[in-house]
Amino acid sequence: MKVDPNKEKALAAVLIQIEKQFGKGSIMKLGEDRSMDVETISTGSLSLDVALGAGGLPMGRIVEIYGPESSGKTTLTLEVIAAAQREGKTCAFIDAEHALDPIYAKKLGVDIDNLLCSQPDTGEQALEICDALTRSGAVDVIVVDSVAALTPKAEIEGEIGDSHMGLAARMMSQAMRKLAGNLKQSNTLLIFINQIRMKIGVMFGNPETTTGGNALKFYASVRLDIRRTGAIKDGDEVVGNETRVKVVKNKVAAPFKQAEFQILYGQGINRTGELVDLGVAHKLIEKAGAWYSYKGDKIGQGRANAGKYLTENPAIATEIDKTLRELLLSNPSALAAKADASTEDNVDLETGEVF
């Protein structure tokens, strides 16, 4: 298609003017942006990293993780922090709920000595701290726990029973407008944990909604819905949860995928169990009866023993993880081949059998 040379000259002139005024890279042709391959941080779950499409949560973006109580929201964010710290990144945790357990965080691999933590008095203070950390360019990951606990100053200073309609929504809307651009500039990942509420009078459709208004829904590049779907038992004792995460929104890859994994109490995401399941599904690990083998060598009888072997041999676990990431991230639809047990059933920790 023939382009008017006068238009080309005018466009070149205005692009030079914009870059001179606002800095290099402030405007460019989309095809020339070589940074479209987004930097990511692992969630701690291989299947969730694959479901996200990019291999983890994207840097420089806003992410919302929501779900019912005790579904694993904080655990998932602590796994992200631990993964980021292993890469030498600086992380901050804004504990608006005043409920962060440092002992549990340490068990998940979080370096609590180097984790920045704030327990703000008001929602405005929490969001101002987020903005200051973001603009510094020195913090890579910020977690806010939770949006529901970000109480506006006017509500705290008022009386119980006073009406404060829309205050939290306005506060979040203003904060999102301010934070979004700064996060992109500083390449900081900001994760909001959110709670679920029920809409009154909804007869058709989903009555569930999240707190804090609609601004976060629009500004978030990724939204994850996390649910507990079953119990993991060791004998009669419940030792963990079967967990399902749905990618409700995704601006960096295809949305609406889901991942299933186990969260063990006091240990976090069961990575080795996930490696065993995915390894068998994609024929990296052989299964004959109850025995599991890798490259001809038996690694354990029963899923739990195979997982224990991988825990004791991290080099082999890393090798399997790397191979699976190369396979699944180049072909995300391959994840659908994983044969999961029904999420409505309980799973025996020792044998992996449904009961």
Curated annotation (Swiss-Prot):
One of the protein's GO biological processes: DNA repair
Residues noted as binding ATP in the record, renumbered to the chain: 67-74
One Gene Ontology term, aspect cellular component: cytosol
Stored InterPro entries: AAA+_ATPase (IPR003593), DNA_recomb/repair_RecA (IPR013765), DNA_recomb/repair_RecA_CS (IPR020584), P-loop_NTPase (IPR027417), RecA-like_C (IPR049261), RecA-like_N (IPR049428), RecA_ATP-bd (IPR020588), RecA_C_sf (IPR023400)
Main location: cytoplasm
Compartments where found: Cytoplasm
Gene3D superfamilies, A to Z: P-loop containing nucleotide triphosphate hydrolases
Protein name: Protein RecA
Organism in which the protein naturally occurs: Shewanella baltica (strain OS155 / ATCC BAA-1091)
